[in-house]
Structures are given as C-alpha cells and as structure tokens.
C-alpha cells in the first residue's frame, strides 16, 4: 500500500529555494522512507498543541518537513519544509 505525496504551493516554493543536493535528500527521504511504508507515522513525530494534532514532522538533517497525513485518501500532504530554526515560526 503506497501513499501518495502531494505538495502545497508553499512547500514547492520552499523546496525550489533549497540547494539541489538538499532538495534531493528531502525528496528521496519522503519517497523511500515515508510514502513507501505501510504506516508513514512510524518514521515521524506528531506535532503537539490544540491546532497541530493532525500534523506530523519528519527530520532530514537540519531540515524539518511538516505534513498532514490523510488516511482515507492514502495521501501525505507536505505543508511546509525548511530549516529547523525557521519552520516552526
């Protein structure tokens, strides 16, 4: 059971701003370790807080990927990504 990866416009813009090597690492991580697994939550961590309950984060080096996992659609929506100092602001 493979999950589909979709990116918001904001996430695509942030991905394009990264250097090519870092962007490739992030995309490879999402393809191989998140979307290909039966349960994408196994390699991530849930964000805490009243409004963040449905969002998950993944760590790739100094970068963080914020996702919304939609079980009914087998879809992982990448909402935001960036350096760990900036992504949570």
Residue ranges and their predicted role:
Residues 67:
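Short, charged interaction patches at domain edges and termini
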């Amino acid at each position: 059971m493979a999950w589909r990866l979709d990116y918001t416009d904001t996430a695509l813009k942030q991905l394009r701003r990264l250097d090519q090597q870092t962007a490739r690492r992030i995309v490879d991580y999402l393809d191989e370790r998140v979307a290909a697994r039966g349960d994408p939550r196994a390699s991530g961590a849930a964000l805490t807080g009243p409004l963040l309950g449905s969002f998950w984060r993944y760590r790739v080096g100094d970068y963080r990927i914020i996702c919304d996992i939609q079980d009914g659609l087998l879809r992982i929506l990448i909402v935001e990504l960036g350096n760990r100092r900036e992504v949570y602001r």
